[in-house]
C-alpha cells in the first residue's frame, strides 16, 4: 500500500510538472481539479461502498486471468470489469492515490485539501479491502477444490 502511495505521488508529480495538464488551455487541469473536489467531498459511506464494489470487479478480473486459458478471453474479461468500474463511478484507492495528488498539485480552490485526500483514500481503501477479501478472495478460497489444486501443484513440482 505504501509503495502504491509513493508510485501515485511520483506519477502525479511527473504528469503535473510535465505541463501536460495545463497545455494551451487549462481545460484538462480544471477538469482534474473539479473531479478531485467531488471525490474529496463524497460522504464516507458512499466512498466505502464505491470502493467495495470497485474491488469486487478488479479482483474478478484478476481471478479470471488465472482461470481463463486464452489470452483474448483474459483481455476481454479485464476490459469489461475495468470498463464497468470506471463508467459506474466506483472508486479504487490506488488510482485515487495518483489522481487526487494531481488535484493537490494543480492550482485549486479550498475544496481540494490534504485532509480530503486522506478522507477519500482511507474510506476507499477500506472498501477495496473488504470487497476483495469478503466477496472474492474468501468465497473462491472456500469453493476451490483443494485436492485438485494439490495434485496440480505436485505435477508442476
Model-derived regions, located:
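Alpha-helical transmembrane segments and their helix-helix packing motifs
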Residues: 1-157
Amino acid at each position: 500500500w505504501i509503495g502504491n502511495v509513493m508510485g501515485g505521488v511520483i506519477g502525479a508529480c511527473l504528469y503535473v510538472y510535465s505541463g501536460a495538464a495545463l497545455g494551451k488551455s487549462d481545460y484538462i487541469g480544471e477538469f482534474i481539479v473539479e473531479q478531485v473536489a467531488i471525490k474529496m467531498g463524497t460522504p464516507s459511506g458512499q466512498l466505502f461502498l464505491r470502493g467495495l464494489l470497485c474491488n469486487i470487479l478488479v479482483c474478478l478480473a484478476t481471478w479470471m486471468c488465472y482461470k481463463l486459458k486464452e489470452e483474448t478471453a483474459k483481455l476481454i474479461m479485464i476490459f469489461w470489469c475495468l470498463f464497468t468500474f470506471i463508467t459506474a463511478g466506483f472508486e479504487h484507492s490506488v488510482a485515487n492515490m495518483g489522481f487526487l495528488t494531481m488535484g493537490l498539485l494543480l492550482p485549486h480552490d479550498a475544496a481540494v485539501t490534504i485532509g480530503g485526500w486522506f478522507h477519500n483514500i482511507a474510506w476507499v481503501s477500506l472498501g477495496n479491502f473488504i470487497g476483495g477479501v469478503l466477496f472474492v478472495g474468501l468465497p473462491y478460497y472456500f469453493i476451490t477444490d483443494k485436492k485438485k489444486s494439490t495434485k496440480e501443484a505436485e505435477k508442476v513440482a
